[in-house]
Swiss-Prot record:
It comes from Archaeoglobus fulgidus (strain ATCC 49558 / DSM 4304 / JCM 9628 / NBRC 100126 / VC-16). The keyword Signal applies. This is Uncharacterized protein AF_1267. Residues 1-17 form the signal peptide. The keyword Signal applies. Keywords: Signal. It comes from the Archaea.
Length: 40
């Protein structure tokens, strides 16, 4: 379960990195970190 969550989180971070050029990286990281913490 934890491994799957980490894999999903990693994939999402990758997509986030693509958008980082047009969006604040820090804000994006905070949002996904919060979502990950909730699911953990």
């Amino acid at each position: 379960m934890a491994v799957a969550a980490l894999a999903m989180y990693g994939g999402t971070c990758g997509a986030c990195a693509v958008l980082a050029c047009n969006w604040n990286v820090r804000e994006c990281g905070i949002i996904w970190k919060n979502l990950f913490e909730v699911k953990k």
